[in-house]
């Protein structure tokens, strides 16, 4: 039995949401690819009949569709990378104003239905994982300095969607762990 059954259940829930997001991203990429091919086909088929203004509009549409496709493909690729190893850390932080946050930290941000599920390791709040032991902590948010108390720190090794280990840690994390997980 895993030492943190709540973490196993959380991982299963995150993987399910990542699967759904990945399917949606795949469908978006396919739709954009189809739109691009249809616009190209239309331009080739009616090349001699299009006036210069319509030709210009279609070329703009192609460029915009290509750009949108590039962004959609990059988003899909990030989701695919996250699915293999969604996150590598968790911190629980109680703000001085009483708000409690559970923050999972991974290579990329992941939101689902407006809820932040995984924070990018470069986000200000994520820095507490590396910079503080459990106890008084804080970070610089866009709205100003947030102070509070770091109540929990966990590290995870998730590979091929399987949690290989999870451990509780009170110490601040050294860069070798960061480099290993982000490589």
Region annotations inferred by a language model:
Residues 1-182:
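Extended, charged low-complexity regulatory segments
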């Amino acid at each position: 039995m895993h030492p943190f059954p709540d973490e196993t259940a959380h991982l299963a829930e995150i993987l399910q949401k990542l699967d759904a997001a990945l399917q949606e991203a795949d469908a978006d990429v396919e739709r954009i690819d189809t739109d691009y091919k249809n616009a190209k086909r239309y331009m080739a088929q009616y090349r001699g009949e299009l006036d210069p203004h319509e030709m210009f509009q279609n070329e703009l549409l192609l460029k915009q569709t290509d750009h949108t496709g590039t962004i959609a493909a990059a988003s899909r690729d990030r989701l695919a990378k996250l699915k293999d190893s969604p996150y590598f850390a968790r911190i629980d932080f109680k703000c001085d104003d009483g708000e409690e946050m559970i923050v999972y930290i991974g290579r990329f941000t992941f939101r689902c239905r407006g809820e932040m599920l995984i924070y990018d390791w470069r986000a200000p709040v994520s820095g507490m994982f590396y910079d503080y032991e459990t106890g008084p902590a804080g970070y610089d948010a866009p709205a100003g300095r947030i102070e509070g108390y770091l109540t929990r720190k966990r590290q995870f090794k998730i590979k091929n969607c399987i949690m290989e280990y999870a451990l509780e840690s009170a110490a601040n994390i050294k860069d070798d762990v960061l480099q290993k997980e982000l490589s």
